[in-house]
Amino acid sequence: MPELATREFWKDLQPIPDCFKPDAKPEVYLRNAPTEDERLYVPFTETVKSRPLWISPSENRWCDILMATSAGLVNRHYHPHEVFAYTISGKWGYLEHDWTATAGDFVYETPGEGHTLVAYEHEQPMRAFFIVKGPLVWLDEKGNADGI
């Protein structure tokens, strides 16, 4: 347990013994995952960086924080599987949709939807947490697959 409970109603509750079953994989705990420390990010495009948080080759899934400190672009692409996004700060959206995400907004992307991610100029950097399954397929100007 990270710290002892004092007044919480559950303070006398004991942890599960042997909580990691034989088929359990290691968990990940990252303090301050959406940090603005750019040393922890890798270039995703010329204007957007990614902080990988978790990658599972066996499940073909990953989680990351995308960040753009000024106007940014992740060019046309689609995901053959669903994607979940939660906006931490800043402002972003898809050119193909009529919404703009700001801090606290949640987005569910349906499988196979093509889009162009744009980050807007804002007083705070655009930071969004993404959960992705499968590849990201780049598209040309007409929406046809152009690479993985």
PLM regions: where:
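Short histidine-centered beta-strand/loop micro-motifs
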Residues: I55, D64-L66, V74-H79, E96-W99, ...
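Conserved hydrophobic/aromatic beta-strand scaffold that supports enzyme active sites
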Residues: S50-P52, C63-I65, F84, F106-Y108, ...
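Short acidic-glycine-tyrosine-enriched beta hairpin
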Residues: P57, G93-T116
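"Short basic amphipathic alpha-helical interaction patches in structured regions
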Residues: M67-A68, P80-H81, D98-V107, N144-D146
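Double-stranded beta-helix
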Residues: Y120-I148
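A short, N-terminal "cap"/entry segment at the start of jelly-roll beta-barrel domains
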Residues: M1-N60, N144-G147
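Glycine- and acidic-residue-biased ligand/ion/polar-headgroup-sensing regions
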Residues: T69-A71, H79-E96
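Residues that flank catalytic or metal-binding motifs in active/ligand-binding sites
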Residues: K49, H81-V83, Q124
